[in-house]
Amino acid sequence: MVTVISLGGSIVAPDKVDEDFLKNFLSLMREFLEKDEKRRFILVIGGGSPARIWQQAYRNICPKAVNEQADWIGIMATRLNAQLVRAIMGDWCVQDLVIDPTKVEPFIGRVLVASGWKPGFSTDHDAVLLAERFKADYVINLSNIEQVYTDDPKKNSEAKPIDKISWQDFLKLTGEEWIPGKNVPFDPVASRHAAKIGLKVICAAGKNLDNLRKILLGESFLGTIIS
């Protein structure tokens, strides 16, 4: 069984590296890997605070900032975070960091760690491509929000949480264009590809590891299912 987890950079490095979270996340991964020899994880790591800070600095310095350059800055931040996650996985992860989801060697270990790829492709999109490549049933997208809402709850107090939504309706909420650093629950370009291949995505709060355990066990959980 291959499970793809897209781990938002805001969870790994909200302002600095969250060491306590990573220790607890490693413990949870170890729990499932030791319990089930057939269980394998693909972890796709986002850029978090380093990506946003360096991208904003670029835009502040260059009024005519080019999206492609901002994207490359974010990609390098994902690679730094992903290399850290790969290192802490130790012997569970025997393969090099995946930087191109279209050129992945056969999955020979128990954990595979991936980072950003190239401009125009978010780590969400990488997660979808890897799920397609290794025939995962779904992607678990962990970020700093518990669920997808009808609107931004920080700006609209009447925004309602959504338990389940179709890809078509989800794209109406987010728009269909990818902009580097855009703050949406799941990248619109990745969403279109997921819809095309019939992939389910579960959006949930990354810090709530008890909730992640429930998702992995197939139990009732707090989050949003997009399919």
Identify the residue ranges that each predicted region occupies:
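C-terminal catalytic "cap/lid" subdomain
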Residues: 1-227
